[in-house]
Amino acid sequence: MRVLVAMSGGVDSSVAAARMVAAGHDVVGVHLALSSAPGTLRTGSRGCCSKEDAGDARRVADVLGIPFYVWDFADRFKEDVIDDFVESYARGETPNPCVRCNERIKFSALASRALALGFDALATGHYARLADGRLRRAVDHDKDQSYVLAVLTAEQLRHAVFPIGDTPKAQIREEAARLGLAVADKADSHDICFIPSGDTKAFLGARIGVRRGNVVDAAGTVLAEHDGVHGFTIGQRKGLGIPGPGPDGSPRYVTGIDAQTGTVHVGDVADLEVTSLQGDAPVFTSGVAPTGPLECVVQVRAHGGVADAVAELRGDTLEVSLRTPLRGVAPGQTLVLYRRDPAGDEVLASATIRATH
């Protein structure tokens, strides 16, 4: 099988490539250049996809004895990930750029090019598993990335390979060391790769500008003025610019954002609880939409907890009733449905949250 391996320059994708080679496949490595600006997309050990990372990936490819290329996806990345991120925050939403990158770059633009060039599959260093075409959580639950892959269609999954999903991270590092890969001890990336400083508010402010509005409490009392709803997210407690806690001394949190009026609503922690969710643009990983209610568990953050729920497709909307309330759920977040399974929870579907109740 001809396999293209997306090599970020980190230990995970490096071991993924090594395993594909060891399995006897015809392997080619590719690193995605995602920034057209001078320098890198990150500073220090933060982020990913820098020139240093490309060099690390090339050195791993040399050790493995496989061809290696750098492909420029900077324009596509800016349009489909960065611009989408900025526009979503301007609408008062809270997007996950890693979800968008997987959906629109790695498993769309990159995978399409790979197939057009005659490759049979695209392998990545994601912590997830595929069994009989079904996407499941990784063995290492702390590193599991099935959430950010849940937007993939059945056709995209058919051409995907996740070689390290059955192995804990510590063992991946040990394997890299045994193979003599210099990235064995390389630090993991955590930050948004296109925000080098880690200051999301400043990044957004530089692109959206000042759009003043008010911060109000449940009674409609104006507590403060702000420079734009992009500086807030549901559940936020710090940096609200308001004069202290509520009348009863309890902390106040962002409970709602109205981008049209520029109003940020604050309340107490109880106001953050939701019992139902509505999501649009649903994707069912099996390729078949359900005809009735689905018993499932729901996850709304990449490394968040889960809640038991019942989901039902009504038209183009995925409606979810939670058996246990969730807190701080924001429009724009990705909603992922799982089926509990001792062999590894199976991803059933994903959608973009549009409303909560």
Curated annotation (Swiss-Prot):
It catalyses: S-sulfanyl-L-cysteinyl-[protein] + uridine(34) in tRNA + AH2 + ATP = 2-thiouridine(34) in tRNA + L-cysteinyl-[protein] + A + AMP + diphosphate + H(+). GO terms for cellular component: cytoplasm. Keywords: ATP-binding, Cytoplasm, Disulfide bond, Nucleotide-binding, RNA-binding, Transferase, tRNA processing, tRNA-binding. GO terms for biological process: tRNA wobble position uridine thiolation. SUPFAM superfamilies: Adenine nucleotide alpha hydrolases-like. It comes from the Bacteria. Residues 143-145 are annotated as: Interaction with tRNA. NCBIfam families: PRK00143.1, trmU. This is tRNA-specific 2-thiouridylase MnmA. It comes from Mycolicibacterium gilvum (strain PYR-GCK).
